[in-house]
Amino acid sequence: MVDYVTDIVVIGAGPIGIFTVFQSGMLSMQCCVIDTLNEIGGQCVALYPEKPIYDIPAYPIITAKELINNLVEQSKPFDPQYLLGQMAEKIEEYMDYLLVKTNYGTVIQCKAIIIAAGSGAFGPNRLPVDNIIDFENKSVFYSVKQISDFYDKSVMIAGGGDSAADWAVELSKVTKQLYMVHRRKNFRCSPNTSLKLDDLFQRGKINLVVPYQIKQLCGKDGKLDYVVVKNITTSEELTLQVDYLLPFFGTSANLGPILNWGITISGYQIVIDPATCRTNRNKIYAVGDISTYPGKIKLILTGFSESAMACHDIYHIVYPNSPLNFQYSTSKGIPKV
């Protein structure tokens, strides 16, 4: 039994998935969006809603949550169907349509599928400390939901990548004490962020703890009191008073059922034709970070472009007898779906 009938099933409700709703709507195609998370926004909302983004056209700075809100508002005229908290498990191909079945038994009939699942299902990489679970979601967090939660607190950031560096810069504005623990003296972040960190280190806004790694967490009832860190060169140990610990060691990606769909995968990404975003399977497309091709640049902006290309190609599947006459949105306006 079919529960929903639509033109396109979009797998993933992150920024690229939401923008796909808008792009398909501009071509008079309807979408049903499936996501394993219980809210719209993907990693942008789940992991870093207040993280500033600087490379969205026309926005000198915008938070991840604001970007999602704007994309949702932009796509509202096309009345998408969101199936949240569900995972697309199976795809069945028929002559004139596809069936997508979720882990909840929901069945959606569509004419094409666009996979916009980012890195797939994801989870944070935990610190290798025995009792870390006791503190998680109480005083150990893998994302920042509200910067104000850390106002006038003693905070430790662990990690040396972009997320650790970016949040160190932002949280230095509100914390009472900020430690940055890393195994190396160099950080893997953008040159601009690196310059900001150097300035904050010199001004004492951030206490740099290198080359150290976290050895032990001390506290009770989920409340962190102290963190013991160990120098990886000299074995010297330091005990630092900390209210909150933010480990940023990346996330582990899991493509889940996608691996069983007969789609060509390379390095946990879906191989596509860069001109159309088609996969090797008929009527199945992939856009955003989950897709790959020679010269691929992993940017939200790139995903937006891929979404537009995929939707324009799918138009010929949905409307095989109607030629697509390209029009700019200024002259076309918002069509009714």
Swiss-Prot record:
Cofactor note: Binds 1 FAD per subunit.
GO molecular-function term, one example from the UniProt record: flavin adenine dinucleotide binding
InterPro entries hit by this protein: FAD/NAD-bd_sf, FAD/NAD-binding_dom, Fd--NADP_Rdtase_type_2, Ferredoxin-NADP_redctase_2
SUPFAM superfamilies: FAD/NAD(P)-binding domain (SSF51905)
Keywords: FAD, Flavoprotein, NADP, Oxidoreductase
Ligand binding (FAD): 35, 43, 48, 88, 122, 289, 330
Record's subunit section: Homodimer.
Family: Belongs to the ferredoxin--NADP reductase type 2 family.
Protein name, as recorded: Ferredoxin--NADP reductase
Organism name: Ehrlichia ruminantium (strain Gardel)
